[in-house]
Amino acid sequence: MKPYLELLQHVLDHGAEKSDRTGTGTRSVFGWQMRFDLNDGFPLVTTKKLHLRSIIHELLWFLKGDTNIGYLSDHQVRIWDEWADDNGDLGPVYGKQWRRWTGPDGVEIDQMQWLVDEIKRNPDSRRLVISAWNVGELPQMALMPCHSLFQFYVVNGKLSCQLYQRSGDIFLGVPFNIASYALLTHMVAQATGLGVGDFVHTLGDAHLYSNHFEQAREQLTRTPRALPSLRLNPEVTDLFAFRFEDIAIEGYDPHPAIKAPVAV
């Protein structure tokens, strides 16, 4: 995970001090890209322990098209709790946009199903793009999409994914985002009969919150360990049929977790 650690160090050393929506304050850079070859191991940060259950269940929740935290709460995942209303609703966030984007004529579009079908039909297409940034529905969202657009690319029988993330909380959020989209790439590849290539992560405003500086410095003192591997149930070939039990991360041996507050 050298690219991630290089980003941490660069922002600590060269980032600009900026105010932000939460009032916490950040150190930030604009425009940063990381590339991970998914054949070299699963890109899961090892210099601190990540909560795997949250990463996997959140992605399955997105793919269900769900926007209520009930499913997450049932599986002891709390990462969206701060933004939900009293009924657990978040408005038309990621799951709604991925699976039920509302077009100008009011017809709902299943972007993810279209994506799987289009990769099979036309793998050389330059239009294999999914967007969560639905301008007309942004005001109704509890949190506007941070990881807002992603594109797939097929060459030599391998599927690569590039994510554009407009805003990245480097210490807490970005490690989750890397793992989530790497996992999604593997799942889409299996559903379309392809191997995996690269995951490319492009960040707009990449920032460290001011109350994460010491945690980031502590993380940078740790020596990275070998990357784990991902094992998917080979019998699952429908992207929307994956369950938690079908996904296994093997050989994950991280350093201890480092606690840090979430900026809401």
UniProtKB/Swiss-Prot annotation:
Q: What is its EC number?
A: 2.1.1.45
Pfam families in alphabetical order: Thymidylat_synt
Q: Which pathway, metabolic or otherwise, does it act in? A: Pyrimidine metabolism; dTTP biosynthesis
Where would you find this protein in the cell?
Cytoplasm
Which keywords annotate this record? Answer: Cytoplasm, Methyltransferase, Nucleotide biosynthesis, Transferase
Q: What is its main location?
A: cytoplasm
* Role, per record: Catalyzes the reductive methylation of 2'-deoxyuridine-5'-monophosphate (dUMP) to 2'-deoxythymidine-5'-monophosphate (dTMP) while utilizing 5,10-methylenetetrahydrofolate (mTHF) as the methyl donor and reductant in the reaction, yielding dihydrofolate (DHF) as a by-product. This enzymatic reaction provides an intracellular de novo source of dTMP, an essential precursor for DNA biosynthesis.
Subunit structure comment from the entry = Homodimer.
Protein name per the record: Thymidylate synthase
| The species this protein was found in | Xanthomonas axonopodis pv. citri (strain 306)
What is the name of the gene encoding this protein?
A: thyA
